[in-house]
């Protein structure tokens, strides 16, 4: 997430590292300078700090995000709050635009106010800022965070910004105060799986008009029933506690092909490849860290899937637009749509940064343990969004920052 409408990095030319792999630090000071996800150029994620002095934290920061979360190293904290919004499950009018070579963002229209308040975790009220979804260069490895070296095809981010105009509480975090200063953002991260079963046929243009306006016959993804009748357990009302067996890939096996789970690009785990959990049911299945006690049920987010499919396919979002020439697409959604069921909202939390320049180190991350499944068509549509003037799409370089190596303390709401 970024607070800026960035230029396109190609507008100012492309730089390459010298023979020693070093990029020259520019004298630029703009905070909306363009950046890239192409790892071979000086505008890419390994060299963001050289683009502008405003981006210096990207290179020397001590709490940079994303990170690989090691579940058994995370510290359990009692009385961490449930993740709830005020007003509860409010449907918002949002506008989504093409963000060039970055993830399209669903931003609330003026007058739309929704807050998250996390007592016992951080002071202050945080106002919904945007929803966006990150993807990778490959279909399997698109999440920015990983857990025990394991990635998922996408990661949704719900971004909240401290509303200092109406709520004057300081943004102090109650996690031990490892870092000075305040957390101006709360970002909720959700690991997104992809699947085919239960998502219906691809919506046509006429259906998309109704979907984007908030009309849907099965709009029940925001309920809480254990048996799926009211909601967070999929639109078919039958996935609840009697549904599928947690994180068993798209076809009920361990991972996409029933092999070693979601183990990165080539069956390895993480940006540097290890063997991690080796295809067991991991943290989202019945055999997670502690069996049933804090297991997960993978929600099929059918309604959200159709919203994202329709939005990413729409020409206003899919076609490349220069800054200042964007056309907004109106979309009705609720920020709870990407989240797991309320009873399964176990999470990891740590003090980190924005994952795009200027990499500001003022983010409290709330990363959901349990995964959510969307249709495979969502991933296809997002990867086909144009990010470049020549029609090159987001599939080429993705929109994920590599995991960062700095050491931060991670806490968790579950044992």
From Swiss-Prot:
Its cofactor is Zn(2+). One of its GO terms (molecular function) is zinc ion binding. Substrate binds at residues 355-356. Pfam families: Carb_anhydrase, Collagen. It is an enzyme of class 4 (lyase). Expressed in the mantle. Keywords: Calcium, Disulfide bond, Extracellular matrix, Glycoprotein, Lyase, Metal-binding, Repeat, Secreted, Zinc. Sequence repeats lie at residues 225-227, 228-230, 231-233, 234-236, 237-239, 240-242, 243-245, 246-248, 249-251, 252-254, 255-257, 258-260, 261-263, 264-266, 267-269, 270-272, 273-275, 276-278, 279-281, 282-284, 285-286, 288-290. Its EC number is 4.2.1.1. InterPro entries: CA_dom, CA_dom_sf, Carbonic_anhydrase_a-class, Collagen. Residues 33-414 form the Alpha-carbonic anhydrase domain. It is found in: Secreted, Extracellular space, Extracellular matrix. Residues 201-297 are annotated as: Disordered. Zn(2+) binds at residues 132, 134, 157. It catalyses: hydrogencarbonate + H(+) = CO2 + H2O. Residues 225-290 are annotated as: 27 X 3 AA approximate tandem repeats of G-X-N. Residues 220-289 have a biased composition (Low complexity). It comes from the Eukaryota. Glycans are attached at residue 27. Acts as a negative regulator for calcification in the shells of mollusks. May function both as a calcium concentrator and as a carbonic anhydrase required for production of carbonate ions, which are assembled to CaCO(3) at mineralization sites. Is important for shell formation in both the calcitic prismatic layer and the aragonitic nacreous layer. Shows inhibitory activity of crystal formation when present in free state but, when attached to the insoluble matrix, may regulate the form and size of aragonite crystal. Homooligomer; disulfide-linked. May also be disulfide-linked to insoluble organic matrix. PANTHER family: CARBONIC ANHYDRASE. Belongs to the alpha-carbonic anhydrase family. Two hypotheses for calcium binding are proposed. Either the Gly-Xaa-Asn repeat domain bind calcium or sulfite and sialic acid provide the necessary negative charge in the N-glycan to promote calcium uptake. This is Nacrein-like protein C2. It comes from Crassostrea nippona.
